Each structure stands twice: as C-alpha cells, then as structure tokens.
C-alpha cells in the first residue's frame, strides 16, 4: 500500500510537546494481551507524550468501527516502554514512525501488530520526520542547529542540514511541509523564521521572518502555508508580543495575510 493511501486510512493524534532534554533507560516488562487488532481504514493512533523525564510516554489505538480503545499498545506488543516524551507520529511506507523526543529515538512499527520493526537512534532531540522518498527523510530537532537527514530503509543518519542564525543552544526546527522540491520548516523556540530547503542540495536557500516563536506549519489545498506564533512569554530574553496567524504563498514564499490576536489568546494561552 502506498504511503498516501496509508495516510488517508490511519490518522494520528499527537499530544503537545516538552522542550527540555534528558535521558532514560529502555525498560522491559511482560506484556498483556492486546484486545484491539486494527484493520486498515478503521483506526486512530494517539501518542500520549507523558511527563518530561518520567519515561512514561504511551501509544493508544482507537478503533473507529467498534469505538473501543486500547492503551499502551507499544509497551504490550514489544515488552518495552515507548520512552520519554512522544512528540509526534507519521505514517509512511506501511509503517508508523513514532518520534520520541527526550529518548532521542524514532521507532518504526507495524500498524497492525504494533511490533517494532526498526529504530533510528543517536538523534539530539527529535521533533518531526518528513519523508522525501523510501530512502531519505528529514528529522527536525530542538537544542540543535541542524536538521538530520536519515535513511528510513537502513534506519541510519546519513547527513545534516545546517540552519543559519542558530547555535546548538538556540537551535529549534519543528514541522515541515513540502511544495515541489522545497521543504519549508518553522523555527519555534527563541526563533521567528521559516526556512526554505532545497531537497536536491539539502541546503537552506531562503528564510522568511514572521512573529516570535511560530509553533506549527501546515499547507492547505490551495498551496498556502499557515503558521501561528505564540508570541513568547513575559520576561523572555527573546521578547514578548501578541500571537499572530500568517498565510504564506508557497510559490513566492511571501506573507499574504497576517491576523493579529490579543495577549493570552495564542497557543498555550500565549504564555509559558
């Protein structure tokens, strides 16, 4: 089954993110029988991020036909905890790819059995994965001024994209969308930019300044990108402003519309 069809059939709900770093040990235990066995087209994966540094992230599965939910399916299928801060999950190539931020790992699982089929390790603090092909994907990071290039087939890191204007301490790249050969990414923590990456050269070729801390990035069916800023927080060394919503044309990489909000009305209430 193609990745596009798989994306239509199985959807994912992700919890909000933690932005600190740390480490944890892989923990194994006896699993329990899993009642729900998903059929393609009848399910919803839910990543539960857990508490930072508690290593209690979990994966749930909701069957949309029976309206039954099974919790901790990764743990029960693999006799292993998912890790510390489940940041996001993406379907591609018939597999579910779970990005576990504070465990520095991405798990690939069979979406029917929930069994692990591979993992990408030695990541700094991964946030999201975007697939360019069966053998190439980008992984965004926080506390790193690079986007990692990985080979999903071999579960290996193959290279890096240097992001301008960042250090390892201030590095922050988040969600990615693609238009033609270009991938766009929002830079969130202590940042105010979107980056444009040429996927043929793996280089940043342009950037666009928006408001303080753009938290997310999506593309609509009209090839318009949308990003919303949280405006930072009071007392932040990077500044504090009211949140805004931006519409950006993907072809020209220019802001077409800016909708300003009030303090306290942005993502997370506009403050941290």
Map each language-model feature to its residues:
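Bacterial N-terminal signal peptides that target proteins for export
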Residues: 2-10
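C-terminal motif of bacterial Sec signal peptides marking the signal peptidase cleavage site
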Residues: 19-22
